[in-house]
Design a protein with these regions (language model features):
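ATP-dependent adenylation/nucleotidyltransferase module used to activate substrates
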Residues: 2-252
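ATP/NTP-dependent adenylation/nucleotidyl-transfer catalytic domains that generate, transfer
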Residues: 2-14, 237-238, 250-381
Length: 381
């Protein structure tokens, strides 16, 4: 069998990421034009800052091509910050007026609730990669604790013994998370599929459109791997899609938003020089030469699903922010939970999702995720 040749190398990605934003805009515009020539497409818009950039920039390019309308799909999972959910329609109206282009916004909803996903599959913890590893490793363990041979490579990764093709320990080994395998917490990567991707697939099948997404290689190893294999316009995949912002960085997204004077959802706060957040301004910030400053948001650095624990090691204060910004939702997330009689595994109850126990297990194993009023949620384990 002939081994597939990657579209790009890691060195090419690093070079692209170093390009100035103006050049990145030109490259992204060319990919959007290529997409427009070959496919009917929609822009996936969560209400987050990166997908807002995708909506704004794509509308600008389509307007320059003489297009009269642009299709936008929002998957309303019900899991985003309320300010993000409300922002979707308002921002589409803003872009439509800004570029004098019709924005046809459609909202889709998941068939399966988040609570049901957790009960049937498990909690999303650490990352998709780690959660999938835990989920599948458990399928390889018999009720008596012996291994049945299924997904043995997942078990090896959790033991830290998996070797790569060169006979070296794999970079994908994750023994630091084996405690999750040994815990009574069900863990799974399937939530995104059930809550986000399945509704998108239904829309795509009905309309014949393919998605333009705002994901970047900087966000995760899986997204970097996908770009290395297929490039921005992955037209030859089983599910064709375009990710024309793949080589943009978080700083690029922030600078574009600032330069365009775009509104952002309230959960982010505002965009400001990072030095100002530390109580001091550098020379460029004082002169308001913002293109030379490192920017940040004064609120959430990222939004996404507020109940999701993917990326929690990079953003450990996520639950604290939720407690401050939306205390009633935070209370439901933390409260409740019990051990199932059938197998002793932890699951949500009608009182809440039971995250207090999940966070306690993480904290006990060196992954510090603070939350307030812990004593109010804890029960006898």
């Amino acid at each position: 069998m002939t081994q597939k040749t990657n579209a790009h190398t890691s060195e090419e990605l690093k070079e692209l990421q170093r390009y100035p934003l103006e050049l990145k805009k030109q490259l992204t515009a060319s990919r959007i034009r290529e997409l427009d020539m070959k496919y009917d497409f929609y822009v996936s818009f969560s209400g987050g800052k990166d997908s807002a950039v995708a909506v704004d920039f794509t509308a600008k390019i389509l307007k320059s091509l003489g297009r009269k309308r642009m299709y936008v799909l929002n998957i309303n999972t019900g899991l985003e910050y309320l300010s993000v959910q409300r922002f979707v329609k308002l921002f589409c109206e803003y872009v439509s007026k800004k570029y004098d282009i019709e924005i046809i916004l459609e909202t889709a909803y998941p068939e399966m609730s988040f609570v049901d996903v957790i009960k049937q599959y498990g909690y999303p913890i650490i990352s998709k990669e780690v959660s999938q590893c835990i989920y599948e490793a458990r399928k390889g363990i018999n009720p008596d604790g012996t291994l049945n041979g299924k997904y043995s490579y997942r078990y090896e990764k959790l033991n830290g013994t998996k070797l790569d093709k060169n006979g070296q320990l794999s970079q994908y080994n994750c023994p630091q998370y084996k405690f999750l395998l040994d815990s009574p917490i069900p863990v799974s990567h399937i939530c995104c599929m059930k809550v986000k991707k399945d509704p998108a697939y239904v829309y795509e099948k009905r309309t014949g459109q393919i998605p333009l997404i705002a994901t970047t290689c900087e966000e995760s190893r899986n997204r970097k791997t996908a770009w290395l294999e297929n490039g921005c316009n992955a037209f030859n995949c089983e599910r064709p899609k375009s990710a024309p912002f793949s080589f943009w960085t978080n700083q690029d997204m922030l600078h574009y938003t600032y330069e365009e004077k775009m509104p952002i959802a309230g959960a982010y706060g505002s965009i400001a020089p990072k030095s100002a957040m530390n109580g001091q301004l550098n020379m460029f910030a004082e002169l308001q030469v913002m293109d030379s400053c490192e920017l940040c948001t004064t609120g959430c650095p990222r939004t996404g699903c507020v109940y999701c624990l993917f990326g929690i090691t990079q953003d450990p204060d996520r639950i604290l922010r939720l407690q401050e910004m939306e205390p009633k939702r935070a209370d439901f997330v933390l409260r409740g939970g019990h051990f199932r009689e059938s197998d002793g595994m932890w699951e949500p109850t009608k009182d809440g999702l039971g995250y207090w126990y999940v966070l306690d297990v993480l904290n006990e194993n060196g992954i510090k995720v603070p939350y307030k009023n812990a004593e109010l949620y804890r029960i006898a384990k």
